[in-house]
Swiss-Prot record:
GO terms for cellular component: nucleus. PANTHER family: MYB TRANSCRIPTION FACTOR-RELATED-RELATED (PTHR45675), TRANSCRIPTION FACTOR MYB59 (PTHR45675:SF93). One of its GO terms (biological process) is regulation of potassium ion transport. A motif (Bipartite nuclear localization signal 1) lies at residues 62-65. Residues 109-147 are annotated as: Disordered. It is found in: Nucleus. Transcription factor. The keyword Transcription regulation applies. Keywords: DNA-binding, Nucleus, Repeat, Transcription, Transcription regulation. The keyword Cell inner membrane does not apply. A motif (Bipartite nuclear localization signal 2) lies at residues 109-117. It comes from Arabidopsis thaliana. This is Transcription factor MYB59.
């Protein structure tokens, strides 16, 4: 002869089941759950009746969100006792162990999400702008330095370069520039002298003839003064 195993109801509780359980708990108390489940005709296990009463139907339960004081107490007790939810629940009247456990898991989930949360768009855009400005500045600096280096390699000396080298190494630094300058002048000054033109020699001969005539005239006056005076007296 086979014993037919009784099947118990599972799943969500209905409103009629909640009312029936409350009535029988008031009659027989909240200790003998197997007996309450059997005499009530709920077709539920004693464990299921107890959990339904403790977590949802007990008149002393608090409804709604936990207060900041309760949340702080949960965190402190969990740090002290760990996951002993029933023990923690006894320190929070009106709160069940299941409710406290759910709060703890929600709290840890939010904390993990905050750590993984990306940066805000404003801070991200400011960082992008600052990085682009840094890149542009480095490129500009590199371009100017490259140009300066190229000019130095080509032998070009600007005034800034000369004064900078004077400050660093003294006045001898500009010696190469000075040598180059005199070498350039020597290119223009070392030509052979040009021959004098023909008209310059003609002018010199004319001036020489005039000088000779003036000398002869003065000589004649000195030698024959009376003749000139006599002749002038006649006239």
């Amino acid at each position: 002869m086979k014993l037919v195993q009784e099947e118990y109801r599972k799943g969500p509780w209905t409103e009629q089941e909640d009312i029936l359980l409350v009535n029988f708990v008031h009659l027989f108390g909240d200790r003998r759950w197997d007996f309450v489940a059997k005499v009530s005709g709920l077709n539920r296990t004693g464990k299921s009746c107890r959990l339904r009463w403790v977590n949802y139907l007990h008149p002393g339960l608090k409804r709604g969100k936990m207060t900041p004081q309760e949340e702080r107490l949960v965190l402190e007790l969990h740090a002290k006792w760990g996951n002993r939810w029933s023990k923690i629940a006894r320190k929070l009247p009106g709160r069940t162990d299941n409710e406290i456990k759910n709060y703890w898991r929600t709290h840890m989930r939010k904390k993990a999400q905050e750590k993984k949360r990306p940066m805000s768009p404003t801070s991200s855009s400011s960082n992008c702008c600052s990085s682009s400005m840094t890149t542009t500045t480095s490129q500009d600096t590199g371009g100017s330095n490259g140009k300066m280096n190229q000019e130095c390699e080509d032998g070009y000396y600007s005034m800034d370069d000369i004064w900078r080298e004077i400050d660093q190494s003294g006045a001898n630094v500009i010696k190469p520039v000075k040598d180059n300058y005199y070498s350039e002048q020597s290119c223009y000054l070392n030509f052979p002298p040009l021959a004098s033109p023909t008209w310059e020699s003609s002018l010199e001969s004319i001036w020489n003839m005039d000088a000779d005539e003036s000398k002869m005239s003065s000589f004649a006056i000195d030698q024959f003064p009376l003749s000139f005076e006599h002749g002038s007296g006649r006239l």
